[in-house]
Amino acid sequence: MSTAGKVIKCRAAVLWEKNKPFSIEEVEVAPPKAYEVRIKIVATGICRSDDHVVNGSIITPLPAILGHEAGGIVESIGEGVTTVKPGDKVIPLFVPQCGKCRACKHPESNLCTHGDLGRAQGTLMDGTSRFTCKGKPIHHFLGVTTFSEYTVVSEISVTKIDAASPLEKVCLIGCGFSTGYGSAVKVGKVARGSICACVWSGRVGLSAIIGCKAAGAARIIAVDINKDKFAKAKELGATECVNPQDYDKPIYEVLQEMTDGGVDFSFEVIGRLDTKVSALMCCQESHGVSVIVGVPPNAQSLTIDPKVLLSGRSWKGAVFGGYKGKDDVPKLVADFMAKKFPLEPLITNVFPLAKINEGFDLLRAGKSIRTVLTF
């Protein structure tokens, strides 16, 4: 029996308060309004940005259903939707693409002015929620909200992908993989034969390593305090691995000595302020490019000597690897299907939604690269 136009009751992981576990609840998901799409989520990844909300370092209205990296199937569409139809495989886009605003029209920008990123309203574009639980409205997250069996998104926040693609794998393209891979090939524009350093070797850092390798870097140095990650980093393309705890000097000095003055490209992936400065300092002073990838804590600022940049270093940043969601995500899925890069090595656990708290525990303990939740 068709569910189009009807309220759907389903399971979702609700975060009622910060620093509390997720609670599996029955929620009601309203049908999509005009220019909205209701999606049955098949698989969703647990991202460190979700945990930043749990611990309060990223602020968004609560209670909320988090999750922003997923793959699913369109269940129904609202009036006026033309880019997807029921039955399509899709990836929700936490960085939307309306195609009409100034940012969308600029070839080097991917931050649509209609996105919830940075505003954290916790609603869809009309200022309301499609979720209720126990009679209370539940907030959305980044306009996508994927820790739920069903979700509703704006049409500008979803893109159709290859019908043959495995959603439990390509869901990673919805955030972490694209963020790391794009930071190397699209934002940093790693040059063939160059020397690169990836500061931190979690899932996004490993994706940056994959990107550096794809771009033809001659040396790729993985930096992490967890030596257990080094084997995977080398499997995916790192030529050397460095643990800062093995040295009695700043890690940027170690990297400068290893590379005759500094790397050509560096990628800071963890989001710590001190590692952002180290990643910049380890670059070659006349031409090195450092890309900020990791999400920094709220309400904190960096202090650096301007002469560090005056000599010729460049400091760049981008969200979602600089990719325009509707334009680029289907291409990335096609590239995965053509075996141009792997996703399987990044997935360490596949859990049902009921084990979401176990997945977050593994993330916090540094014992997983990516945990995928299935419904």
UniProtKB/Swiss-Prot annotation:
<feature type="binding site">
    <location>
        <position position="229"/>
    </location>
    <ligand>
        <name>NAD(+)</name>
    </ligand>
</feature>
<dbReference type="GO" id="GO:0004745">
    <property type="term" value="F:all-trans-retinol dehydrogenase (NAD+) activity"/>
</dbReference>
<dbReference type="GO" id="GO:0042573">
    <property type="term" value="P:retinoic acid metabolic process"/>
</dbReference>
<feature type="binding site">
    <location>
        <position position="68"/>
    </location>
    <ligand>
        <name>Zn(2+) 1</name>
    </ligand>
</feature>
<feature type="binding site">
    <location>
        <position position="47"/>
    </location>
    <ligand>
        <name>Zn(2+) 1</name>
    </ligand>
</feature>
<dbReference type="Pfam" id="PF08240">
    <property type="entry name" value="ADH_N"/>
</dbReference>
<keyword id="KW-0560">Oxidoreductase</keyword>
<dbReference type="InterPro" id="IPR002328">
    <property type="entry name" value="ADH_Zn_CS"/>
</dbReference>
<dbReference type="InterPro" id="IPR020843">
    <property type="entry name" value="PKS_ER"/>
</dbReference>
<dbReference type="InterPro" id="IPR013149">
    <property type="entry name" value="ADH-like_C"/>
</dbReference>
<dbReference type="GO" id="GO:0005829">
    <property type="term" value="C:cytosol"/>
</dbReference>
<comment type="similarity">
    <text>Belongs to the zinc-containing alcohol dehydrogenase family. Class-I subfamily.</text>
</comment>
<feature type="modified residue" description="N-acetylserine">
    <location>
        <position position="2"/>
    </location>
</feature>
<keyword id="KW-0520">NAD</keyword>
<feature type="binding site">
    <location>
        <begin position="293"/>
        <end position="295"/>
    </location>
    <ligand>
        <name>NAD(+)</name>
    </ligand>
</feature>
<feature type="modified residue" description="N6-succinyllysine">
    <location>
        <position position="340"/>
    </location>
</feature>
<dbReference type="GO" id="GO:0008270">
    <property type="term" value="F:zinc ion binding"/>
</dbReference>
<keyword id="KW-0479">Metal-binding</keyword>
<comment type="subunit">
    <text>Homodimer.</text>
</comment>
<dbReference type="GO" id="GO:0042572">
    <property type="term" value="P:retinol metabolic process"/>
</dbReference>
<dbReference type="Pfam" id="PF00107">
    <property type="entry name" value="ADH_zinc_N"/>
</dbReference>
<feature type="binding site">
    <location>
        <position position="224"/>
    </location>
    <ligand>
        <name>NAD(+)</name>
    </ligand>
</feature>
<dbReference type="InterPro" id="IPR013154">
    <property type="entry name" value="ADH-like_N"/>
</dbReference>
<keyword id="KW-0963">Cytoplasm</keyword>
<feature type="binding site">
    <location>
        <position position="98"/>
    </location>
    <ligand>
        <name>Zn(2+) 2</name>
    </ligand>
</feature>
<dbReference type="InterPro" id="IPR011032">
    <property type="entry name" value="GroES-like_sf"/>
</dbReference>
<dbReference type="InterPro" id="IPR036291">
    <property type="entry name" value="NAD(P)-bd_dom_sf"/>
</dbReference>
<feature type="modified residue" description="N6-succinyllysine">
    <location>
        <position position="234"/>
    </location>
</feature>
<feature type="binding site">
    <location>
        <position position="101"/>
    </location>
    <ligand>
        <name>Zn(2+) 2</name>
    </ligand>
</feature>
<protein>
    <recommendedName>
        <fullName>Alcohol dehydrogenase 1</fullName>
        <ecNumber>1.1.1.1</ecNumber>
    </recommendedName>
</protein>
<feature type="binding site">
    <location>
        <begin position="200"/>
        <end position="205"/>
    </location>
    <ligand>
        <name>NAD(+)</name>
    </ligand>
</feature>
<feature type="binding site">
    <location>
        <position position="370"/>
    </location>
    <ligand>
        <name>NAD(+)</name>
    </ligand>
</feature>
<feature type="binding site">
    <location>
        <position position="112"/>
    </location>
    <ligand>
        <name>Zn(2+) 2</name>
    </ligand>
</feature>
<keyword id="KW-0862">Zinc</keyword>
<feature type="binding site">
    <location>
        <position position="104"/>
    </location>
    <ligand>
        <name>Zn(2+) 2</name>
    </ligand>
</feature>
<feature type="binding site">
    <location>
        <position position="175"/>
    </location>
    <ligand>
        <name>Zn(2+) 1</name>
    </ligand>
</feature>
<keyword id="KW-0007">Acetylation</keyword>
